[in-house]
Amino acid sequence: PFRTAILRGEPRSGKSLLGRWFAHAGLGETIDPADAMEETALFHRWNRAQEEGTALLLIPEKAPWEIALPDLRSRLGAALALEIGQPDDDMMRDLIVSHAARRGLMLGEDALTYVVPRMTRSFAAAERFVAVLDRLALERQARPTRNLCRDALETLYGPDQGRLL
């Protein structure tokens, strides 16, 4: 019955991007970060959205979202809960390829097959890995090979990470 959803996910998972798309497509209003908004103001915005028939997408920055105002807490408890989960191997691969392409890096299949199972499963980790890989490639004037990927993993996670598995 309520036209409100709460979208959660880890940092760098694309929550804000989805919220902008939602609003720009005219699907409703996005409040991001919703947990930074004063609770009484958010309560009134929620009520106004229901009265106007406007969909509302709330994106809290922190989890759990502690709500002190009882009326707001009960209303948000009835909202649709959406969550962007941790990326699986296929998503990690796609994230690495995407971040690398934006930096002009082309990773070969051998490098990707090596890196993906050794990575921490998070959107931010994929971004950090490619940033380190890009820096190492520039410093060494080298292509992003399997060996350079191993060095990037070791830079991020320590000297044994590149040898795991």
Locate predicted features:
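Short conserved motifs of the RecA-like P-loop NTPase core
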Residues: 106-119
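Conserved P-loop NTPase "ATPase switch" module shared by AAA+ and STAND
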Residues: 25-41, 45-48, 52-62
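Short regulatory helix/loop adjacent to the ATP-binding pocket of P-loop NTPases
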Residues: 64-77
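Conserved AAA+ ATPase "SRH/arginine-finger" region at the nucleotide-binding site
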Residues: 79-91
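Walker A/P-loop nucleotide-binding motif
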Residues: 4-18
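Conserved C-terminal helix/linker of AAA+ ATPases
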Residues: 137-156
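Conserved AAA+ ATPase "sensor/coupling" helix adjacent to the nucleotide-binding pocket
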Residues: 75, 79, 93-106
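The conserved phosphate-sensing helix
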Residues: 119-131
